[in-house]
């Protein structure tokens, strides 16, 4: 029965929680719009190309305007990204060449070069990031701060170097003080970690869940005993070795060649979990293709999957988390502070329904209508909060149906 719940959760998550980008190809104004990133807004490549043109005009009108150049480059970068084009593309090179003429040696130019070089195989992008770290402006934005936080983490220095730790801490604190991430994303991240055992390993996918978790740890001093590990970083030797050292285990010895990056992830994950002997959890954004047979060892404990080589009553743990650890009341409360609902990330709230609907059914089967109805209200509220079309919301409401 527990395995069935797991399979259902994984299947619905794969089909329902990975949103497709909506197309907004029209421009209602000739003024450029702020490029807030794909985790915030859902636009297509054509929209970003149009914004690149508009921001380029603005930058050319005032060639020393770093914000205009940053927005122009960001638009070019996202246009390429949505077409699966990375590295020094013609689109980004055209913008970078202009930036080199007008704002050379600036924070904006150095960070843009870092982002570009980072995506080029065999290129060392770190010199550009190091230059940018020496030029951090007081009004640094969310995307730039997040980029540097990720760089510092990937370097592996955050595990041992005091200066790197301080810089990362200051940048993360700045994200919190500037309300860079909506509170509902932080509340979701908090609930995910509330149900974990102490000193846990938390393997995670996606920018929003990772930054949300790090803000809780660094700015609010919560869940600091847990290691929040972006799975994609495990492919980076410097990060991987530093992580292993911090866990008190020998560095992972990678083979010279792997059939795929997913095979590397599989071996590294198994190695770290088994050698560290710590409880290990995976976010529901975990892509099972990254680790072959991992779904056979993952058990839904509420909002995260726990890794276990042996079967156990995971639904009992999920119910205990719902009753004793998760703070779900906020889903029913009015919004006291008006804050953005990020279209590119709001689907994360659907994981409440996807992951916890099996718990509602478990309550019903046990005849516990009180807990079943209460939890169903919370989950329905999480879906209602999103801006999805009603017909799409209904697909999630149907997860509470007694029909098989």
Label every PLM stretch briefly:
Residues 1-30:
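Bacterial Sec-dependent N-terminal signal peptides
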Residues 195, 199, 206-210:
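Local sequence-structure signature of Cys/Sec-based thiol-disulfide redox active-site neighborhoods
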Residues 203-207, 231-232:
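Short His-Asn-centered micro-motif
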Residues 211-215:
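Phosphate- and divalent-cation-binding pockets in alpha/beta enzyme and binding domains
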